[in-house]
Amino acid sequence: MGSPCALGLFCCCSSCFCLCCPRHRPASRLAAVVGGATAVPAVVSGVTGLILSPSPSPIFIQPTPSLPMSFHNPGLELALDSRPAPLAPLGVTSPSAPPLPPVVDLPQLGLRR
């Protein structure tokens, strides 16, 4: 077994690396550790993320920042706007531009305006 860490996980030096353990915490705070652990919650520089390990290969932190609801982001407001924004002035076309991806309905993802 190992010793419990701040996240309530056990640090087993032979099989996994716990990012909150000072012994295994990388100096750069970017997790590039090797192990066969499954998705384990971790905190890296105040941003919550998951260690994803589909196979016994190097695993990395995928940051999942949680923004407060009062955070003002003009880009997000544009994305939530139901009216399409003009991409170019009238009469100007760009035939080499790739097609736009389909619009994701944000309420289906559990986000509220």
UniProtKB/Swiss-Prot annotation:
Region (Interaction with the capsid protein): 47-71
Segments of this protein annotated with the region Homodimerization, and interaction with host AMBP/bikunin: 71-113
Any one Pfam family match given in the protein's UniProt record, by short name: HEV_ORF1
Topology in membrane: Lipid-anchor
Region (Disordered), start-end ranges: 89-113
Record region (Hydrophobic): 1-21, 32-52
The keyword Phosphoprotein appears for this protein: yes
Subcellular location: Host endoplasmic reticulum membrane; Host cytoplasm, Host cytoskeleton; Virion; Host cell membrane
One Gene Ontology CC term in the entry: host cell plasma membrane
Region span, Interaction with host HPX: 27-67
Residue ranges of the TM segments: none
Origin: domain of life: Viruses
Region of interest (Interaction with host SRC, HCK, FYN, PIK3R3 and GRB2), residue spans: 94-103
Keywords from the UniProt entry: Host cell membrane, Host cytoplasm, Host cytoskeleton, Host endoplasmic reticulum, Host membrane, Host-virus interaction, Lipoprotein, Membrane, Phosphoprotein, Virion
Stored InterPro entries: HEV_Orf2
PTM annotation, UniProt: Palmitoylated in the N-terminus.
Motif PTAP/PSAP motif: where in chain: 95-98
Positions carrying Phosphoserine: 70
Family indicated by similarity: Belongs to the hepevirus ORF3 protein family.
Role description: Small multifunctional phosphoprotein involved in virion morphogenesis, egress and counteracting host innate immunity. Plays critical roles in the final steps of viral release by interacting with host TSG101, a member of the vacuolar protein-sorting pathway and using other cellular host proteins involved in vesicle formation pathway. Also acts as a viroporin and forms ion conductive pores allowing viral particle release. Impairs the generation of type I interferon by down-regulating host TLR3 and TLR7 as well as their downstream signaling pathways.
Note: The viral particles present in feces and bile are non-enveloped, while those in circulating blood and culture supernatants are covered with a cellular membrane (quasi-enveloped).
Assembly, per entry: Forms homooligomers. Interacts with host SRC, HCK, FYN, PIK3R3 and GRB2 (via SH3 domain); binding does not activate the kinases. Interacts with host AMBP/bikunin and AMBP/alpha-1-microglobulin peptides. Interacts with host HPX/hemopexin. Interacts (when phosphorylated) with capsid protein ORF2. Interacts with host TSG101; this interaction plays a role in viral release from the host cell. Interacts with host SIRPA; this interaction down-regulates the phosphorylation of host IRF3.
Free-text domain note: The PSAP motif is necessary for the release of membrane-wrapped virions from infected cells.
Protein name: Protein ORF3
